[in-house]
């Protein structure tokens, strides 16, 4: 092996070890423990729009969702079928899990 090849391998090893160290030193994101599928959660669109930068909000049963930041119009979604802990509720309002 030439010295040029050895230098390439050494640089790669240093970068790989540095990457591993950086990944292990950062706090890990907690993963959901329930195994619900996306079909359990079906938000419904509300017939209105919103714009937080202009203080235009959704009605009380809907939540404003914008994609991006700045002066952007968002879409209102009804989230009444979700208990906000990650479990979908049955149509009668009782938790099915």
From Swiss-Prot:
Localization of this protein: Secreted
An MF annotation (GO) of this entry: C-X-C chemokine binding
GO cellular component: extracellular region
Keyword Cell cycle: no
Primary location: secreted
Signal sequence bounds: 1-25
Keywords assigned: Disulfide bond, Glycoprotein, Secreted, Signal
Glycosylation sites (chain numbering): 55, 78
Cysteines engaged in disulfide bonds, as pairs: 46-62, 50-64, 58-76
Function in brief: Salivary chemokine-binding protein which binds to host chemokines CXCL1, CXCL2, CXCL3, CXCL4, CXCL5, CXCL6, CXCL7, CXCL10 and CXCL11.
The protein's name in its UniProt record: Evasin P1142
Natural source organism: Amblyomma cajennense (Cayenne tick)
Source taxonomy: Eukaryota, Metazoa, Ecdysozoa, Arthropoda, Chelicerata
């Amino acid at each position: 092996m030439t010295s040029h090849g050895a230098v390439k391998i050494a640089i790669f090893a240093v970068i790989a070890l540095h990457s591993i160290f950086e990944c292990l030193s950062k706090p890990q994101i907690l993963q959901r423990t329930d195994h619900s599928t996306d079909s359990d959660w079906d938000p419904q669109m509300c017939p209105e729009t919103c714009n937080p930068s202009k203080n235009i909000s959704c009605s009380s049963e809907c939540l404003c969702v914008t994609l991006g930041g700045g002066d952007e119009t968002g879409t209102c979604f009804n989230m009444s079928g979700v208990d906000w802990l990650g479990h979908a509720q049955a149509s009668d309002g009782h938790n099915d899990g």
